[in-house]
């Protein structure tokens, strides 16, 4: 599952745009002669925050195809045995998981990887890299596909969108509360004065800063959902196959990460980061060692 990219980057961009619109056209609805109307502000921020998150959710599948170069497999005309096997395996796993058959695709990447995305568990996309097809045996590949189907069946994208929407709302709310405080106490705005340019600049900057800091909450959920998807993969394809697939992926963690930054949240594996690396609090995936240890504790064949 590629680290928190496509969804979060799109969401952050929409959040900033929503914040600008809110600051320019919605100030009068929560700014009065006596200062901030916190009740109105919270409601407005909740609406704007959820809109940003839902836009990201509905765009996720389209963005995934564009950023990774995923080529969909025609379910009625697979071009070779590998494509035919992928379609059959995904169809079987989807049926067992109780979801509709997702779109299936292949994206060009030497790194072994895969992802699942989509706004609805019955309208999803599962894609694997060309490198994954070349280097994994069928049992391991089936486990990876089961892991991705697990993400879809668990409704991880919808849950992520709801969490991100709430986070967005509080980011926008506190950015404006802090911005108003600074505008009054640093720039000297009086109660009877409208917010000035300093207020708008401060809230825009705080939207970005608070958005990055608050992403730690979303990162925590991303790590949690990996354990759940691993469990789903183990139950659908076998625990040993899931462990074997993860250990094979571990050997590639020293390779440079070839996934677009926008898609890292949804990949099954992360390559080695180039340059500065954020603290574990901002990691979207548990380590392979942690994931394998959790699988060993799982009570399933």
From Swiss-Prot:
Binds 1 zinc ion per subunit. It is a multi-pass membrane protein. One of its GO terms (cellular component) is plasma membrane. Its cofactor is Zn(2+). The chain crosses the membrane at residues 4-24, 38-58, 155-175, 200-220. Its EC number is 3.4.24.-. GO terms for biological process: proteolysis. The keyword Heme does not apply. GO terms for molecular function: metalloendopeptidase activity; zinc ion binding. The active site is at residue 148. It is found in: Cell inner membrane. Zn(2+) binds at residues 147, 151, 226. Keywords: Cell inner membrane, Cell membrane, Hydrolase, Membrane, Metal-binding, Metalloprotease, Protease, Stress response, Transmembrane, Transmembrane helix, Zinc. It comes from the Bacteria. NCBIfam families: PRK05457.1. Belongs to the peptidase M48B family. This is Protease HtpX. The lineage of its organism: Bacteria, Pseudomonadati, Pseudomonadota, Gammaproteobacteria, Moraxellales. The gene is htpX.
């Amino acid at each position: 599952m590629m680290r928190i990219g496509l969804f979060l980057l799109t969401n952050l961009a929409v959040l900033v745009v929503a914040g600008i619109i809110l600051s320019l056209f919605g100030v009068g609805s929560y700014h009065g002669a006596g200062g901030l109307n916190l009740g109105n502000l919270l409601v407005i921020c909740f609406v704007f925050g959820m809109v940003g998150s839902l836009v990201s959710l509905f765009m996720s599948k389209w963005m995934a195809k564009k950023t990774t170069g995923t080529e969909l497999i025609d379910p009625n005309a697979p071009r070779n045995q590998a494509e035919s096997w992928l379609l059959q395996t995904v169809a079987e796993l989807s049926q067992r998981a109780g979801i509709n058959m997702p779109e299936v695709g292949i994206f060009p990447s030497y790194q072994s990887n895969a992802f699942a995305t989509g706004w609805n568990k019955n309208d999803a996309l599962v894609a694997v890299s060309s490198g994954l097809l070349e280097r994994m045996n069928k049992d391991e590949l089936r486990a990876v596909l089961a892991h991705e189907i697990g993400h879809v069946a668990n409704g991880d994208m919808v849950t992520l969108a709801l969490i991100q929407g709430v986070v967005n709302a509080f980011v926008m709310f506190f950015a404006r509360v802090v911005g108003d405080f600074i505008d009054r106490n640093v720039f000297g705005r009086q109660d009877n004065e409208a917010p000035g340019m300093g207020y708008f600049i401060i809230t825009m900057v705080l939207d970005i800063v608070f958005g990055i800091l608050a992403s730690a909450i979303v990162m925590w959920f991303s790590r949690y959902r990996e354990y759940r998807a691993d469990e789903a993969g183990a139950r659908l394809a076998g625990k040993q196959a899931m462990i074997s697939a993860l250990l094979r992926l571990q050997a590639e963690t020293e390779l440079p990460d070839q996934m677009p930054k926008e898609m890292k949240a949804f990949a099954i594996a992360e390559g080695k980061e180039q340059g500065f690396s954020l603290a574990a609090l901002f990691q979207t995936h548990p380590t392979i060692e942690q994931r394998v240890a959790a699988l060993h504790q799982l009570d399933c064949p």
